[in-house]
């Protein structure tokens, strides 16, 4: 849970030094809009997490199939949102400045959601330190990418930094 505000804060810190306030607000809006997808995932996780922990020894094949199906559904939902993103920005015309990098924000969310399955597996295998290492490497990737790209590309560089952080963590 700490990753979401941490990665966001790193991007916004770099944007604070290199981008005007309007671009920072545009980035924050796109990020918040992309995060709405996680509310669906959070509702499902309320059921899925306890089920995985209770049945991982006896239902491994079923858990694996459901996990694969969920990954496919998440990726499909991502594709649909990207395909119909114009409709979102017809509803919010004042926020259309985030249209070029909104797909990157969605991709970062997809990596974050997919990472949750790995977290369950690491906990069951009693290797949660791997999650900590993944988080630390994700933070390092976020800082490095933002340091290189934000001064030159502004908000687009921050969006790439966000994707890099979540992809590295995954």
Model-derived features: where do they sit?
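Membrane-interface junctions at transmembrane-helix termini in multi-pass inner-membrane proteins
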Residues: 54, 107-137
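Alpha-helical transmembrane segments of multi-pass membrane transport and lipid-handling proteins
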Residues: 40-44, 64-112, 143-152
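Transmembrane helical elements of multi-pass membrane transporters/channels
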Residues: 1-50, 108, 112-116
